[in-house]
Amino acid sequence: MPPEVIPWMSPCLSQSMSFVLAGIGHPMKFRRGDVIYTSPGLFGNLMYVRSGFVVKALLDPVRDEPLLLSMAGPGALCGNYENLYVRDRMPRRHWCLTSTEVLVVNQELLLKIADQNPEWQHELSGYSSVSSICDRMGMFLNYSGTVEERLGALLLLMLHCEEPAAMANLFSKGVEWVELPFYPDKGTIAR
């Protein structure tokens, strides 16, 4: 089954690939605001998000300002995943929007395991493409809506990724508000 394409949100991996990553990764926890990946760098970890949200941004090389591309929620990759198949050498920074738990995974080991199963190999090779589509859809929304529309869309998409069942409450008769399970920092919302 192809991954769900949602603007601003990195695609989630299949359940079978998630089990593989759980078997070969080691857990790490980060606090809100922690920078967990910067490129170019000497070392970069491939990470699988178990809980929380990670902001993924390109850096403007002239001003060192981030351009929000997407967010990785539970079930998505972050960190040095671009080097699995894409080597564009664009400077990037990933930081935690909320308290986050990730699994740090050895890239070479993951690729060797994926070579044993054509479905996993296809999933990993297509991950960068689907991520690019999500990023570009988010950039389109950045330029097509008002600030209020963009913020509302971002919060709804985050709610959809974190708690899909809560989305049903939005369309229930008589419900005037739905509590968000997270609170993005002002800097991320401002971008």
Predicted regions and their residues:
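Short amphipathic alpha-helical elements of helix-turn-helix/winged-helix folds
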Residues: L154-M158
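Cyclic nucleotide-binding regulatory module and flanking cytosolic helices
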Residues: M1-R32, L77, E82-Y85
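Conserved active-site beta-strand element of glycosyltransferases/polysaccharide synthases
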Residues: L103
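Short, leucine-enriched amphipathic alpha-helices that occur as contiguous helical runs
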Residues: A76, E148-G152, K186
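A small-molecule sensor/coupling module
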Residues: L109-R150
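Phosphate-/nucleic-acid-contacting segments
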Residues: H160-R191
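Cyclic nucleotide-binding regulatory domains
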Residues: M9, D34-T98
